[in-house]
Curated annotation (Swiss-Prot):
<comment type="pathway">
    <text>Amino-acid biosynthesis; L-histidine biosynthesis; L-histidine from 5-phospho-alpha-D-ribose 1-diphosphate: step 5/9.</text>
</comment>
<keyword id="KW-0963">Cytoplasm</keyword>
<dbReference type="GO" id="GO:0005737">
    <property type="term" value="C:cytoplasm"/>
</dbReference>
<dbReference type="InterPro" id="IPR010139">
    <property type="entry name" value="Imidazole-glycPsynth_HisH"/>
</dbReference>
<dbReference type="GO" id="GO:0004359">
    <property type="term" value="F:glutaminase activity"/>
</dbReference>
<keyword id="KW-0028">Amino-acid biosynthesis</keyword>
<feature type="domain" description="Glutamine amidotransferase type-1">
    <location>
        <begin position="5"/>
        <end position="209"/>
    </location>
</feature>
<dbReference type="GO" id="GO:0000107">
    <property type="term" value="F:imidazoleglycerol-phosphate synthase activity"/>
</dbReference>
<dbReference type="GO" id="GO:0000105">
    <property type="term" value="P:L-histidine biosynthetic process"/>
</dbReference>
<dbReference type="InterPro" id="IPR017926">
    <property type="entry name" value="GATASE"/>
</dbReference>
<keyword id="KW-0368">Histidine biosynthesis</keyword>
<feature type="active site" description="Nucleophile">
    <location>
        <position position="83"/>
    </location>
</feature>
<keyword id="KW-0456">Lyase</keyword>
<keyword id="KW-0378">Hydrolase</keyword>
<protein>
    <recommendedName>
        <fullName>Imidazole glycerol phosphate synthase subunit HisH</fullName>
        <ecNumber>4.3.2.10</ecNumber>
        <ecNumber>3.5.1.2</ecNumber>
    </recommendedName>
</protein>
<feature type="active site">
    <location>
        <position position="190"/>
    </location>
</feature>
<keyword id="KW-0315">Glutamine amidotransferase</keyword>
Length: 209
């Protein structure tokens, strides 16, 4: 099969080119776009994002991308959310007042202050994987190190959504979710070295299947 076309949704929230480059490295044909026709024509969709919740939702609304994302997920097209692209899938955030996409029940919460704890949670940290939770964990070490930059985390109402957790200080929070063909992670695969590339390789393999 030829390289699968993966649409990277462009809504002016963060550098999309590092995600695009990483997908290229693992054998995909990435396309950065905010045009619904191009996004729907792809084999899979990635929603990255860095920044704050309210501006992200405002940009998605302005570009009329909310119904596009909803339809893609409803149709079961392979979907990967990264960082802010995970958070906007939930109902709301303590960071702002805008409603999220509400694909899943739950909210985005801020890390609690602890003595000596740095917020944002920034740098490399180890995941605790739920092995059966996601085909994206194939060929990864048991407790892989990945790269985080965030002050907020998702708290799903349905615990079965959680595919991986991470500890920051005394707090264990959701690091990734998985449901059918939808996956989303709080960490940055494109900044997570060999582990991140393997995760993206697994996503591309899933698209090829």
């Amino acid at each position: 099969m030829s390289a699968p076309a993966i649409a990277i949704i462009d809504y002016d929230m963060g550098n999309l080119h590092s995600v695009s480059k990483a997908l290229e490295v693992v054998g995909a044909r990435p396309l950065i776009s905010d045009r619904p026709a191009e996004i729907f024509a792809a084999d899979a969709v990635v929603l990255p994002g860095v920044g704050a919740f309210d501006p992200a939702m405002a940009r998605l609304q302005e570009r009329e991308l909310v119904p596009v994302i909803e339809q893609i997920i409803e149709q079961g097209m392979p979907f990967l959310g990264i960082c802010l692209g995970l958070q906007v899938l939930f109902e709301c955030s303590e960071e702002g007042t805008e409603p999220g996409l509400g694909i899943f029940a739950g909210k985005v919460k801020r890390f609690q202050s602890e003595p000596g704890l740095t917020i944002p949670h920034m740098g490399w940290n180890q995941l605790t994987l739920r092995p059966s939770a996601s085909p994206l964990w194939q060929h990864l070490p048991p407790s892989p190190w990945v790269y985080f930059v965030h002050s907020y985390f998702v708290a799903p109402e349905d615990p079965s959504l959680v595919a991986a957790t991470v500890c920051h200080g005394q707090q264990t929070v959701t690091a990734a979710i998985a449901r059918n063909n939808l996956f989303a992670c709080q960490f940055h695969p494109e900044k997570s070295g060999a582990v991140g590339l393997q995760l993206l390789r697994n996503f591309v393999a899933l698209v090829k299947d």
